[in-house]
Amino acid sequence: MLNFELITTDGNARRGRVTLNHGVVETPIFMPVGTYGSVKAMSPLELNEIGAHIILGNTFHLWLRPGLDVVNAHEGLHKFIGWDKPILTDSGGFQVFSLGDLRKITEDGVTFASPVNGDKLFLSPEISMQIQRTLNSDIVMQFDECTPYEIDGRAATHEEAAKSMRMSLRWAKRSRDEFERLANPNALFGIVQGGMYEDLRDESLAGLSELDFHGFAIGGLSVGEPKEDMMRVLEHVAPRLPAHKPHYLMGVGTPEDLVAGVAAGVDMFDCVMPTRNARNGWLFTRFGDVKIKNAAHRNDPRPLDESCACYTCRNFSRAYLHHLHRVGEILGARLNTIHNLHYYLQLMREMREAIEHHRFADFRRQFAADRARGTQ
């Protein structure tokens, strides 16, 4: 089940509400990534406390470990991981195509060697839909080929991007057919591909629109292309997506990317950046980024961001976070992750409020000025 209510707009920016089988998601929203069924360093309780409405799980990795038998014994991913709110699962396609020489692509699907134990495995649109049905995720993604930005060290040609996109379209129909055959009560999103070529993106969207997906994602961005190319494609595709369906930008990105995405008409985002950067001591704040390992923070008694209400900023100094990072304490990674995810989710809250009050352009200007100011 999916119901999307478009509450209001401000330019191309959209304030919406997505109702799914496990709850309501206020949009625009950021989805923390829980690759193996866990958002790294965070408990479900902590995710609730910082305002996460929905998290992302990885079909490919959960299929390999712990395996579908284990998840099925818990009647799905929600009970297995102790999370009672919505979950989106990707199709596994991106991970398979990231294996490079370890995989072989045909019209049927992808044959590859398991990165866990080397076993020969096969993943197809049908198998991806079956796995995601067992996981019982609220939002299922079609199986697609993520068109690479580079092939053999050069930009993908129009012909290469077209071939890849058209196979993804054929796989989209097979995904839709299998989703319906399984009588899956959840939602299925199609993925717009086409590389850096606007005409191919238009062709992809036209083909997907005929299949009547519950929502639409923009794939194949943030895969190594220059930022200006990413923004060019994003600003071309997002306003053309069906207005009455949710819009999801996959795997993006920085705080600046989220604001630009919302301005273009995107409702949903996911990225490992806030969690991965947190573990590496790279912290996002309203006034720019903090690299906590730097010696400048050794004796700094201030919080990361005095305007931030997260547990980390309310209780600990930059000096303590610097110390934890330098000595490799696990608590450092946890406190950093709490802060970064809180910052991302607070940013989304502020954008929702700005759109509601039709002052998104003012918000965007202030956001850019604050981030450019830098931390003192």
Swiss-Prot record:
Binding site residues for Zn(2+): 308, 310, 313, 339
Cofactor dependence: Zn(2+)
Classification via Gene3D superfamilies: Queuine tRNA-ribosyltransferase-like
Residue positions of the active site: 90 (proton acceptor), 270 (nucleophile)
GO MF annotations, alphabetized: metal ion binding; tRNA-guanosine(34) queuine transglycosylase activity
Keywords: Glycosyltransferase, Metal-binding, Queuosine biosynthesis, Transferase, tRNA processing, Zinc
Cofactor note: Binds 1 zinc ion per subunit.
One Pfam family it belongs to: TGT
GO cellular component, one term: cytosol
Broad class of enzyme this protein falls into: transferase
SUPFAM superfamilies membership: tRNA-guanine transglycosylase
Example GO biological process: queuosine biosynthetic process
Region (RNA binding): 251-257, 275-279
Pathway this chain belongs to: tRNA modification; tRNA-queuosine biosynthesis
InterPro entries: ArchSynthase1/Queuine_TRR, TGT, TGT-like_sf, tRNA_ribo_trans-like
Family to which this protein belongs: Belongs to the queuine tRNA-ribosyltransferase family.
Subunit and interaction comment: Homodimer. Within each dimer, one monomer is responsible for RNA recognition and catalysis, while the other monomer binds to the replacement base PreQ1.
Protein function: Catalyzes the base-exchange of a guanine (G) residue with the queuine precursor 7-aminomethyl-7-deazaguanine (PreQ1) at position 34 (anticodon wobble position) in tRNAs with GU(N) anticodons (tRNA-Asp, -Asn, -His and -Tyr). Catalysis occurs through a double-displacement mechanism. The nucleophile active site attacks the C1' of nucleotide 34 to detach the guanine base from the RNA, forming a covalent enzyme-RNA intermediate. The proton acceptor active site deprotonates the incoming PreQ1, allowing a nucleophilic attack on the C1' of the ribose to form the product.
Protein name in the entry: Queuine tRNA-ribosyltransferase
Gene name as annotated: tgt
